[in-house]
Every structure is written in structure tokens, then in C-alpha cells.
């Protein structure tokens, strides 16, 4: 009972804190583009119409060729996801300030209600995809993801260098930073 009350209180606090006025998100299609958008802003991306579920991850990673891609699978209703985003913010900011080729990508599905998602993402710098249930569930199934948050890191060539699919959750600042550095230094 106490755990439930604590969890509900935490979820309420996270929800209320995400209601603060934040910068507006920009929308962009998923066709390959030049890297003209500001990496320290919020960019909404969409997948090409009719893309097979098997190609979703490859398509997203391909958008960021030449960059290390840190993917966060999350949902607006997930308290641990929101907590993890707060934890990774200083790491993200340090790479953005250093102008390192690192893209932070956030993927969720329709279980994150559209209005809540639109209200939440302005406080989360990076690239955002909100997939259909079919796309999101298919992607989670294909990767073997059983829970969120889950992280996946690809190097500048699009090759996986790290994931925590088996265990899920936020792996910690040290692991995330070490894996980003590993990916940046990979030839």
C-alpha cells in the first residue's frame, strides 16, 4: 500500500513538473535531410509511410549517419522513464555543448497519449518519434524489449555498440557515458 501511494505521488509530481511552459517542438519529416536543425532543440520526426516493422530501427539510425545514436525507448506514463531522462540530461548537455556527433533519439508509441506526449517533449531535447501501436509493439518485439526505459546505442556507422534490452531500466551515468565514448572512438 505504501509503495503504491509513493509510486502514485511520484507519478503526480513528475506529471505536474512536466506541465511547466517549455520551448515549442518543431516537426520534421523522416526523409533524409541536411543537419540544419539545432541539436539542442526538440525535433519531432516521422517514419516514411508503409515502412516494414523490420526496417524501423535501421531507418531511424540511418537518419543520423556519422553520429553516435543514443536511443531511449520510453512512454509518458512511465515514471522510471521520466526519471531516467532527468538523469541523462547533464550527459546530453555535455555532448551538445562540446558539439560532439551524438544524437539523442526518443521513441514511444500510442500508449503515450498524443496530448500528453506533445505536452511532455518540449522539455526533452533531442529527436522524437511517436510510432503507431503496430510499429512500436513490433519494434519492441523484434528487439526483444520487455520493459521500458530501455537504451540502445549505435556507433557512427550504425552498428550496435550497447543495449540494455535484457535488463531494461536506466543503466546509470557511468555506463551511458562509457558506451557513448566507446562508440565515438570506434573506427
What would you call each of these model-derived segments?
Residues 1-51, 187:
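N-terminal targeting signals for export/organelle localization
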Residues 48-69:
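A short beta-strand-turn-helix
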Residues 54-61, 85-92, 114, 118, ...:
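Extracytoplasmic/secreted envelope proteins and their assembly/folding machinery
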Residues 67-69, 73-77, 147:
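Short pre-active-site segment immediately N-terminal to redox-active cysteine/selenocysteine motifs
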Residues 71, 105-107, 152:
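Conserved hydrophobic packing residues within short motifs/helices of P-loop NTPase cores
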Residues 73-90:
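Conserved redox-active cysteine motifs that mediate thiol-disulfide chemistry
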Residues 83, 134-181:
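Thiol/disulfide oxidoreductase modules built on the thioredoxin-like
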Residues 93-135, 145:
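Conserved segment of the thioredoxin-like fold in thiol-based oxidoreductases
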Amino acid at each position: 500500500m505504501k509503495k503504491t501511494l509513493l509510486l502514485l505521488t511520484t507519478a503526480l509530481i513528475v506529471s505536474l513538473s512536466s506541465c511547466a511552459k517549455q520551448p515549442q517542438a518543431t516537426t520534421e519529416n523522416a526523409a533524409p535531410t541536411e543537419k540544419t536543425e539545432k541539436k539542442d532543440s526538440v525535433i519531432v520526426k516521422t517514419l516514411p509511410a508503409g515502412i516494414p516493422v523490420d526496417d524501423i530501427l535501421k531507418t531511424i539510425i540511418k537518419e543520423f549517419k556519422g553520429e553516435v545514436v543514443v536511443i531511449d525507448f520510453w512512454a509518458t506514463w512511465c515514471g522510471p522513464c521520466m526519471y531516467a531522462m532527468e538523469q541523462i540530461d547533464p550527459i546530453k548537455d555535455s555532448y551538445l555543448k562540446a558539439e560532439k556527433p551524438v544524437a539523442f533519439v526518443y521513441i514511444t508509441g500510442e500508449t503515450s497519449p498524443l496530448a500528453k506526449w506533445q505536452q511532455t517533449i518540449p522539455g526533452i531535447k533531442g529527436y522524437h518519434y511517436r510510432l503507431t501501436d503496430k510499429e512500436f509493439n513490433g519494434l519492441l518485439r523484434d528487439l526483444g524489449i520487455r520493459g521500458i526505459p530501455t537504451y540502445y546505442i549505435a556507433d557512427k556507422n550504425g552498428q550496435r555498440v550497447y543495449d540494455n534490452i535484457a535488463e531494461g531500466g536506466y543503466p546509470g551515468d557511468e555506463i551511458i557515458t562509457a558506451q557513448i565514448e566507446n562508440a565515438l572512438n570506434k573506427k
